[in-house]
């Protein structure tokens, strides 16, 4: 089995640049995932985020999760649970407007630390999008502009904890899915594993590494690249020991952004993917998250065809 792609971003600044860009290209085309080290976010910032996130879970969320488990009788399940996940989560929105000051139970230090962390992640996401542009032969800023919409991109962080699970063979931490959006930056626990991706019909562990950022590509980048880059299925396996922390930050198109394959990436006039408004895709995704992505793309194609038909009738 090939090794999971680990990219040292510092190598972009020296003789290793061409090799590093090729590694990023290969990861985007064949894995849909890669792991970044030396990405520019200070280790002490990440350590503080981890300490405060785990402290907040212990103080505010652990007991609620235990009560939820008890109320649903999940400790005693005998058959596979297919309609919920073994995770405790909350969501922080950063762009276009922040909700950090409104989220209950966060102390002021945690709010400030997460605001700072989000700014650093936003900058890193935009740097990565430009590296993807370079590899794709697109002008710098193309992907950021494609995501922009009228109010800029959507950017937010799903803060998750995956507590010890008594029946990990019957309950997933997070069921298999692809991510609907753009580019996802994950700061995950370096001691408790669980994240897996599907490659060549095999589930492969994403290795926990201290101070790394795991990057994966969402459905919108598969569309814009006309399938050159892949959004892949992934899942979280619950563990019997240890609570796994995960902060997944989603840099997504704005709600009204119109998403379609970049014209320069359509070879021999073959456009594989549809044109659609991002918010329409998200409405469809909400009900189909844990199903394959291909039917979602087909549904958007049908919607696109209907829009074109209406336009033709209107102009006739």
UniProtKB/Swiss-Prot annotation:
UniProt tissue specificity: Expressed in all of the floral organs examined apart from the sepals.
Keyword set, alphabetical order: Ethylene biosynthesis, Fruit ripening, Iron, Metal-binding, Oxidoreductase, Vitamin C
Cofactor(s) this protein requires: Fe cation
Classification via InterPro entries: DIOX_N, IPNS-like_FE2OG_OXY, IPNS-like_sf, Oxoglu/Fe-dep_dioxygenase_dom, Plant_2OG-oxidoreductases
PROSITE patterns recorded: FE2OG_OXY
Pathway annotation: Alkene biosynthesis; ethylene biosynthesis via S-adenosyl-L-methionine; ethylene from S-adenosyl-L-methionine: step 2/2
Binding of Fe cation, residues: 177, 179, 234
Protein name: 1-aminocyclopropane-1-carboxylate oxidase 4
Species per Swiss-Prot/TrEMBL record: Solanum lycopersicum
């Amino acid at each position: 089995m090939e090794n999971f792609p680990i990219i040292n971003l510092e190598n972009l600044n020296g003789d290793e640049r061409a090799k590093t860009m090729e590694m990023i290209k290969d990861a985007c085309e064949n894995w849909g995932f890669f792991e970044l080290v030396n990405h520019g976010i200070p280790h002490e910032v990440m350590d503080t985020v981890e300490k405060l996130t785990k402290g907040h879970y212990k103080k505010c969320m652990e007991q609620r999760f235990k009560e939820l488990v008890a109320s649903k009788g999940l400790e005693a399940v005998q058959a596979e649970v297919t309609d919920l996940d073994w995770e405790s989560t909350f969501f922080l929105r950063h762009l276009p407007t922040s909700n950090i000051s409104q989220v209950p139970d966060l102390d002021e230090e945690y709010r400030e630390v997460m605001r700072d962390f989000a700014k650093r992640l936003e900058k890193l996401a935009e740097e990565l999008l430009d590296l993807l542009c370079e590899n794709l032969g697109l002008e710098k800023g193309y992907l950021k502009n494609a995501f922009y919409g009228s109010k800029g991109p959507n950017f937010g962080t799903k803060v998750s904890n995956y507590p010890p699970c008594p029946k990990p063979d019957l309950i997933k931490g997070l069921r298999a899915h692809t991510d609907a959006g753009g580019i996802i930056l994950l700061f995950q626990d370096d001691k408790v594993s669980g994240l897996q991706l599907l490659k060549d019909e095999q589930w492969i562990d994403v290795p926990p590494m201290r101070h790394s950022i795991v990057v994966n590509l969402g459905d919108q980048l598969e569309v814009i690249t006309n399938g050159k880059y892949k959004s892949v299925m992934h899942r979280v396996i619950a563990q019997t020991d240890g609570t796994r922390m995960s902060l997944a930050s989603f840099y997504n198109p704005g709600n009204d952004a119109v998403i379609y394959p970049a014209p320069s990436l359509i070879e021999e006039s073959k456009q594989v993917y549809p044109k659609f408004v991002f918010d329409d895709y998200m409405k469809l995704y909400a009900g189909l998250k844990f199903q394959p992505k291909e039917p979602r793309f087909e549904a958007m194609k049908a919607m696109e065809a209907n829009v074109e038909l209406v336009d033709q009738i209107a102009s006739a």
